Amino acid sequence: MARSMKLACVALVICMVVIAPMAEAALSCGTVSADMAPCVTYLQAPNNASPPPPCCAGVKKLLAAATTTPDRQAACNCLKSAAGSIPKLNTNNAAALPGKCGVSIPYKISTSTNCNTVRF
């Protein structure tokens, strides 16, 4: 009986160690990309362009979904990666996007952002 309790405890600890990191960051890059997809044309547009309403809806949805520090860091890393893959990215528009959508995020959307410093 004592041996089976030890095995059960060991199994529980192993499950906690394996599952905990997966639960930390609930946001995937797929989710971030889907929310931000309507913004690509704005991010490639000349300065002073206005983001389309579906873009701002995606920005607000992403902000609402990023409720923890790991979520915000995951979103930041996904945005940083996406910014690096958009041809002809207008970095001024990328940096201005949250403000133009009426929200505030604690970092600049840029390929040089240090996402490890992002906190909730």
From Swiss-Prot:
SMART domains: AAI. One of its GO terms (molecular function) is lipid binding. Expressed in roots, stem, leaves and tendrils of the mature plant. GO terms for biological process: defense response to bacterium; defense response to fungus; killing of cells of another organism; lipid transport. PROSITE patterns: PLANT_LTP (PS00597). It comes from the Eukaryota. InterPro entries: Bifun_inhib/LTP/seed_sf, Bifunc_inhib/LTP/seed_store, Plant_nsLTP. SUPFAM superfamilies: Bifunctional inhibitor/lipid-transfer protein/seed storage 2S albumin. It holds the Pfam family Tryp_alpha_amyl. Residues 120 form a propeptide. Residues 1-25 form the signal peptide. Keywords: Allergen, Antibiotic, Antimicrobial, Disulfide bond, Fungicide, Lipid transport, Signal, Transport. Transmembrane segments: none annotated. Disulfide bonds join 29-78, 39-55, 56-101, 76-115. Belongs to the plant LTP family. Plant non-specific lipid-transfer proteins transfer phospholipids as well as galactolipids across membranes. May play a role in wax or cutin deposition in the cell walls of expanding epidermal cells and certain secretory tissues. Binds saturated and unsaturated lipids, jasmonic acid and lysolipids. Has weak antibacterial activity against A.tumefaciens A281, C.michiganensis VKM Ac-1144 and P.syringae VKM B-1546. This is Non-specific lipid-transfer protein 1. It comes from Pisum sativum (Garden pea).
